[in-house]
Amino acid sequence: MAVYYSIRPQLAEIPAPKNEDSQSSLPHIIIMTPEEAANGTFLQTNMYVKLEHSQEVRFCKAEAHKDFLYGTFVIPPKSNNREKIAFRYLIAKDRIIFIEDGGFVKHMIDKMQQAILRENPGIGFFFSDFLDMLISEDLLYLTEIENQIAHLEDEVLAGTLENFNHKIMACRRKILVCSHYYLQLSDISNILQQNDHGFFTRNELASFRLFSERVGRLHEEALMLREYSTQLREVYQAQIDIRQNKICLLYTSPSPRDPKTS
């Protein structure tokens, strides 16, 4: 069943209205399943069915349509036991609708409900807070990747080269996914800042700019990790070359002559 929140200084879950036309004038959040979205009057009016069936959720994006913003999120896994998370969203003048089928968005909003208070709440502030929550633990995750690379570096310098390529490629794949993710989030923020529909106040636009700066720093961190991993691969290759040279010398060096036979 769809879940409704009223955007107040502190987010508050509210009962579902009997029909969509009876919703209050206060800005609000709705979380619904794809099935509920396909049957919703507001979403049908705004051509959600056409959008839903014509586009597969593959990456993070935002699109400006006539009277609303529509987009998708794909959150990359940040642990070994979690798959990527995908959901859709729609932003209108007085509401934000999330379409998901797994409970991730509700979990995030429940965390925001406990942690965030705003004197002047609005849909723009809510969405910027939501974006911030998405990346709140990413620096820690990037630090974990850095520690993994540093551990590999210690192994290489100690002469332990077993499964190095497999391990470093796993790190580089994580870095690449994060790098693309941050660029996509930056694109979303840029589209929000254009404010084509006039949904957001000046202060809300400033909060999107701050998010852009945060995600930009994360992207820079990912690029530095990629460079670190590249340098480590070069060190590893140098170690391999040294070993191969020693083996070649062993087989090509003349054996010492026996003085008795000379």
Language-model regions, residue ranges each:
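Conserved small/polar residues in nucleotide/adenosyl-binding loops
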Residues: 251-256
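N-terminal low-complexity segments that are often proline-rich with Ser/Thr-Pro
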Residues: 259-262
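Helix-boundary and N-terminal cytosolic regulatory elements
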Residues: 1-118, 184, 188-194, 200
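Extended amphipathic alpha-helical scaffolding segments in membrane-proximal extra-membrane regions
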Residues: 74-242
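Soluble-to-membrane junctions at the N-terminal ends of transmembrane alpha-helices
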Residues: 240-250
